[in-house]
């Protein structure tokens, strides 16, 4: 499969944008290579968020907690949870039960396999690591987890293939470990 170079794609998109919005100044756009304060997120994030909310019990907006964690993470996917009040607010929770609601969502994300939490000086919720969401969803699908519909999973797979998300096709870490042990 021959891929079009990114520069060529970028030029095509820039040319189209200029034709559609000739009065638009490039200074009005967000440039991740110019401004600080950005993070990389999977292009499948909207689908991931929908799946998380489908899997979370009740009408919880667990996906907003997940997105807030991504907003705090760097490439190491580690998040300090030292300021629970702030993280709860960023997740959309206010009032007396804000931190409690946030902690419930954090537990749900950990239970579903999207994050891992570690205790420390701030108590039970001191540190978090964000796991590969595609792997988490693939595991949930393989386990037949209620709430993960075929339509949602297939949409994620389709989008993953369309954007070249190799982690939708490669063996999961535990599968690679089993293969390595079997080869011994």
Segments from the language model and where they lie:
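Short flexible/disordered coil segments
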Residues: 2-16, 134-143, 181-184
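Winged helix-turn-helix DNA-binding recognition segment
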Residues: 55, 72-128
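Short, hydrophobic/aromatic alpha-helical segments in well-folded domains
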Residues: 51, 105, 114, 130-131, ...
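Eukaryotic intrinsically disordered, low-complexity regulatory regions
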Residues: 169-184
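Short, amphipathic alpha-helical interaction segments positioned at domain boundaries
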Residues: 133-172
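Short recognition helix of helix-turn-helix/winged-helix DNA-binding domains
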Residues: 1-85
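Charged/polar, solvent-exposed surface patches and flexible loops
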Residues: 50-54, 67, 86-89, 104, ...
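Short, cationic/aromatic linear interface patches
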Residues: 25, 117-120, 126-139
């Amino acid at each position: 499969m021959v891929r079009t170079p990114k520069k060529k794609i970028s030029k095509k998109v820039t040319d189209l944008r200029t034709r559609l919005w000739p009065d638009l100044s490039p200074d009005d756009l967000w440039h991740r290579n110019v401004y600080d304060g950005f993070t990389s997120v999977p292009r499948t994030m909207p689908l991931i968020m929908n799946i998380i909310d489908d899997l979370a019990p009740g009408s919880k907006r667990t996906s907003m907690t997940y997105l807030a964690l991504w907003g705090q993470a760097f490439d190491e996917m580690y998040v300090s949870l030292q300021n629970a009040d702030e993280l709860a607010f960023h997740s959309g929770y206010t009032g007396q039960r804000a931190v409690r609601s946030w902690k419930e969502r954090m537990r749900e994300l950990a239970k579903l396999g999207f994050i891992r939490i570690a205790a420390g000086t701030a108590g039970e919720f001191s540190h978090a690591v964000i796991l590969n969401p595609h792997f988490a969803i693939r595991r949930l699908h393989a386990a037949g987890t209620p709430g993960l519909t075929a339509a949602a999973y297939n949409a994620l797979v389709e989008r993953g293939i369309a954007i070249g998300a190799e982690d939708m096709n490669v063996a999961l870490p535990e599968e690679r470990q089993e293969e390595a042990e079997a080869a011994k």
